[in-house]
Amino acid sequence: MNFINLQAQYLAYKDEINAKIESVLSSSSFIGGTKLNEFEQNLAHFLGVKHAIGCSSGTSALYLALRALDIGKDDEVIVPSFTFIATAEVVALVGAKPVFVDINLSNYNLDFKAVQKAITPKTKAVIAVSMFGQMSDLRALEEILKDKNITLIEDGAQSFGASFKGEKSCSIAKISCTSFFPSKPLGAYGDGGAIFCHDDEISKKIRILLNHGQTQRYKHEFIGINGRLDTLQAAILNVKLKYLEKELDKRQKLAQIYNANLKNCQIPQIDPNAFSAYAQYSVLVEDRASVLQKFEKANIPYAIHYPTPLHKQPCFSEFSNLELKNSEYASEHILSLPFSPFLSEEEQEQVICIFKD
């Protein structure tokens, strides 16, 4: 059994993917070009946004978002502590201060009341992570921020394809970012990501920054990075994008089976207004150590997303005295189960059996 069965996915689309790879290899056009342009247009159409910009990873997408907003020294950016490190890492990389706040245990996303309490005159942005594939009510969060000159950024690394009240993840915030890491709902065969916005000037600046700050060849207006999405990944992702909604439907069905059959754990709590992309299927278990022993004895893969909240990480030691009870509880009790659109009925039953004792 695989935690995420990427091989089965490849075999399902093998002929199309191989043809696209061969097309790129034959063209000898590996950076930029029509394949990348086509993918970006398809992304924008899928979300209903004006601008979709392919980039080298979800991390570079977040970094470029902050750079495009001129966030830096003496600025503060509010982030959740229960998330992958990239969300806060990029804040530190641009010279700003990450301000860690707690989450709701219902959806593992930002606690909006905690966000309100954390706002200071130095707050320039809030990065809202759509954890495990479920969005928060970003319109409600926008309402909190709108009169304070604070920009909302969605970290939709895990939620591409999700929606809230019919509005898709990565289509609402001033700038939204996603990841195409292989395990994500829309995954590449390597690293990749994208940035989404409706603002022409922000889009223009991001495109300059991700290409070493060049406004024309060898003329560098800004200190930028190599943040480009390569053409080969764009071609592969373009194939997978066609099947995303079909895969999302399968994720819903598999999640419903887990929901109906898992015992002795807290299953994901999905808001009635939300459609989750179920990037992971994660549960809370009271005695995680004993459950993990059962998984290991049965040779069933699992993951812990995430074992240490960011304010307890060594690289953020200056925040170690913070008490963020929900983030700490989640890190101690969270467990991600084998899950992908290609999880078989037999494999899922093996996982369910672990929780029956």
Give residue spans per PLM region:
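Short beta-strand->loop structural element characteristic of the AMP-binding/adenylate-forming
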Residues: K97-N107, A303
